[in-house]
Amino acid sequence: MINQHMVRTYRGFTLDPFQQEAVAYIDKNQSVLVAAPTGVGKTLVADYVIEKIYNEGGRVVYTAPIKALSNQKFKEFKAHVGEEAVGILTGDVVINPDAPILIMTTEIFRNMLQESPERVGDVRYVIFDEIHYIDDPQRGSVWEESLIFMPNTMRFLGLSATIPNVDQLANWIEDIQGQAVQIVTASERVVPLRHALFEQSLGITTMGRIKKKHRRYRGIPRHVLLSEDLVKPTTHLDLIDKIKDGYLPCLFFTFSRRKCESNALELGEYHDFLNGEQKRQVKEIIEKITDRYPDLKSERWPSLRRLLMKGIAYHHAGMLPVLKDIVEELFTHRLISVLYCTETFAVGLNFPCKTVCFDSSTKWDGVSFRPISNREYFQMAGRAGRRGIDTEGFVFTIVDLSYFDPSEFPSMKEQEIEPLQSQFALTYNSILNLIKNYEEEDIYRILGQNFATYQAFAEQEAVLTEMEMIQEELEKYSAHLQKKSGPDIFGKLIRRKLQIEAQLHNEYNKRTKRRLKKDIRGINRRLEGILHKNLPHVDQRTLRRERRIYRRLLARYERLIVREGELDPHEKYIQEFLDKKALLEALGYLEDDELTAAGELASQIHGHELLVTEMFMEGMFHDYSVPELNAICVSIGYEPRKNEIRIKHKIDMSGILRIWHFITKMEQRFIGYPTAQFNDHVAALAYRWTNGESFASLLEDAAIDEGDLVFAFRRGIDLLRQLRNATIEDPVLNGKLRECIAKMDRDEVSIWL
């Protein structure tokens, strides 16, 4: 609630009601969860916390889901409070780690809580930006672990996009932390969004009009529609032509890197959005950034530079970081009118525009094409509408009538955004750190504190309540049918059936389960016989209606029994813990619930820790040369892109492959699936880079995008840093690892902050 004592302005901005409310709770030293639409100013609350704690002489941690957002925040606060006060930790970058303001990825914060909690023991506040990432299938567990292991003396600020189950998330955190969590929500956007579809013959239109036109062509094959010009494909050029006067700047989300580039190049053939003065500014900014890279060579750069001089650009993860920096800087200065980008551009980074366009409502998720979710849609659409500039933001989605399927479009209603779901997972590293720091009963308690278990218990209560209600209804109809059907046999059969189903739910012996299922089938046959019996003294219409109701109730009850049986994640996590613990014992990482030397090393490695530890224990990191070691570290966990060609090399990796096959076999035996990955597709390039070759010469042989190669090298640097930190007591290896890092972290691969 707002009162007269609330802070109403900050950094010259008049705070919105939700910002005032959040700041008021922070001033009372309370934890706050803010859920509000993308682009309404949640970040201003984070800035207030950071500045407040710093001015009071305390320490504060800001965590982000992606390194680009961490880097952006580091630059902002370095400029605001001075570089001595701000540090950054992102795995591959470490600057001023003891600073009072620490910017880091959420993974680093989780790792510090598990391995060296004393390093963050004096932190007063931690900020979880984009906390809805708890729902991310690959990384969501990191947010859960951070919240579980965070000391309850530490306060937190969670910033989330709009989520329907924010109360459930806050209640779970209260439950595990033992501290109150204040919820602040905002549903209205300062700059409202207008959503529409676009089809070249209809123009900017509605779903209703699209459906009406599509009905005319129902049943006609696509090739006929196109060959006879019944339907003309709608392109990005059609949409840009429609919005170029009055709707720019525009972010054009395209779920393909190749299409990002080809669309931008195609637009550049027809349009130039900049005047002479703007072109001069573009040239000045480009020169300022490229001065840091005198030998910058990229196949993309000449054509991208020509596009930038026209106010057109593209942005995706396959680009060199310096090229992305140039595009971002120009967009910030309002010198880009149309930017084709992939969805990563929408994560956290503050780049508002007037209009957001989608070239499709479906995306490839690594397995298949699927419709984008409402949350994904609004994460991107929320960039439309610039505060203080636009009265409304516009969101347009291209429709191809020859492919049209209304079920593949998000609802475009913010109130229908999907709820968060837990993605909790147990890694070998987490298990080793749990065993290292907690007693057995505390470990089992912690395993029950995850968000998945909390959500399951909540659903379980609802399921059991509904089962009780249905059971009462079943007994009522059972009594009715029993009176009409004759003896008491019907009611007895029902009671017996429910007893067996409850027993079946808790039975694990396969033979007993088969017998119980056979008993249920026998009872079902007898019940059906009674239900189908024609009774001349009974009104047959009423009896048929009651039988139908009874069958529906019984079917629903049986579905609920199955669902209730699925809702026991605590047992699932305990079993997963025991299976992985048994594997760690078999590998010699644990003895009598104590970590061995191998276990200690694995507890400090995050990702592919079994492969790394086994290699270390066999002396491989000591034996390989610096270039070979870099090639190997880049290969550990490397995931080649589809159809990527492996570049041949002469490094003997037979020992590593032997270990990898051994670990894969052990994982299949103990947990039923492998996790270790080793792919040497770019090992040769890492070897040559370490020996001093230029990045341009590597790209002549590279079978992947230049940005992907930089990412692979930086992942290798991250692993090398972890190994360096874990082997401080081995000065020879430690020195070699430092040399490895120095030779990898140079020129185009370095990050400038």
Where are each of the predicted segments found?
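Conserved pre-motif I regulatory segment
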Residues: 1-35
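Motif I (Walker A/P-loop) of helicase-class P-loop NTPases
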Residues: 42-51, 139-144
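Conserved nucleic-acid-binding Ia/Ib motif block in the N-terminal RecA-like helicase ATPase lobe
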Residues: 58-111, 171
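Conserved C-terminal RecA-like helicase domain
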Residues: 61-63, 71, 78-88, 253, ...
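SF2 helicase catalytic motif II
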Residues: 106-109, 116-157
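Conserved interdomain linker/interface between the two RecA-like ATPase lobes of SF2 helicase motors
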Residues: 148, 155-157, 162-174, 178-266, ...
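Non-catalytic terminal extensions of ATP-dependent helicases
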Residues: 313, 318, 332-336, 424-753
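Conserved segment of the helicase C-terminal RecA-like domain
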Residues: 351, 355-365, 370-411
